Amino acid sequence: MEDFVRQCFNPMIVELAEKAMKEYGEDPKIETNKFAAICTHLEVCFMYSDFHFIDERGESIIVESGDPNALLKHRFEIIEGRDRTMAWTVVNSICNTTGVEKPKFLPDLYDYKENRFIEIGVTRREVHIYYLEKANKIKSEKTHIHIFSFTGEEMATKADYTLDEESRARIKTRLFTIRQEMASRGLWDSFVSPKEVKRQLKKDLRSQEPCAGLQTKVSRRTSPALKTLEPMWMDSNRTAALRASFLKCQKK
């Protein structure tokens, strides 16, 4: 699994995942499934934010080629991938600037168009189960939740999927590719252990609390990219490099 992760994810994503695990005293060489899961989550967060800007009229637009116009503002602030101290500094700055309520837990992104924090989830299980876990943990309707699965399903707070269908399809395609590549290497079954999932489901169901007022809907429609964190946004050369990395697995 470790070899797969290093072959199929951008080196910057791998480095961020290693740092995140070491921050919590975890070893990527031992907890390889977690290593793969963290890399996948990081990539989805970066892909979620890619190419999305806000123009001078406050409208959300997509710019995929070349350097964006200087008048454009990046729609999403990336919080995931930073060390905890820096991440909370970014969150506090956003709250002080926008007046939004400070979340109890570190979110993954901030959406400047909708003025809300976003929690991204990537699950190997049923999307509605994972959604409930996230909602029960966060216990706040102010943080928007968006869950993706490796099967092309998704679920979001109040069925508001934030992104256009093409952007979401790009994420779903990448997740499906990761699943196929794991399966071709005989890694998928160990990544999704039925016994482990069953035990976790029983534990989750025992600890669940009602999520009143959270309207959800599952989308079953199945229809690259990485921003640097400092500086935050990617130039066209880096985008092209990541596109090549994105296609690496498919070419094997």
UniProtKB/Swiss-Prot annotation:
Molecular functions per Gene Ontology: RNA binding
Where does the protein end up? Host cytoplasm; Host nucleus
Its main localization is host cell
The entry's keywords? Decay of host mRNAs by virus, Eukaryotic host gene expression shutoff by virus, Host cytoplasm, Host gene expression shutoff by virus, Host mRNA suppression by virus, Host nucleus, Host-virus interaction
Fetch the Pfam families from UniProt.
Flu_PA (PF00603)
* List of catalytic residues: E80, D108
Q: Which superkingdom?
A: Viruses
Q: Name one GO biological process term.
A: viral translational frameshifting
InterPro entries per record: PA/PA-X, PA/PA-X_sf
Q: Where does the record place the site Important for efficient shutoff activity and nuclear localization?
A: K195, K198, R199
Write down the position(s) of the site called Important for efficient shutoff activity: K202, K203
* Function recorded in the entry: Plays a major role in the shutoff of the host protein expression by cleaving mRNAs probably via an endonuclease activity. This host shutoff allows the virus to escape from the host antiviral response. Hijacks host RNA splicing machinery to selectively target host RNAs containing introns for destruction. This may explain the preferential degradation of RNAs that have undergone co- or post-transcriptional processing.
Q: What is known of its domains?
A: The probable endonuclease active site in the N-terminus and the basic amino acid cluster in the C-terminus are important for the shutoff activity. The C-terminus acts as a nuclear localization signal. The C-terminus is recruited to host protein complexes involved in nuclear Pol II RNA processing.
- Similarity field: Belongs to the influenza viruses PA-X family.
The protein's name is Protein PA-X
Organismal lineage = Viruses, Riboviria, Orthornavirae, Negarnaviricota, Polyploviricotina
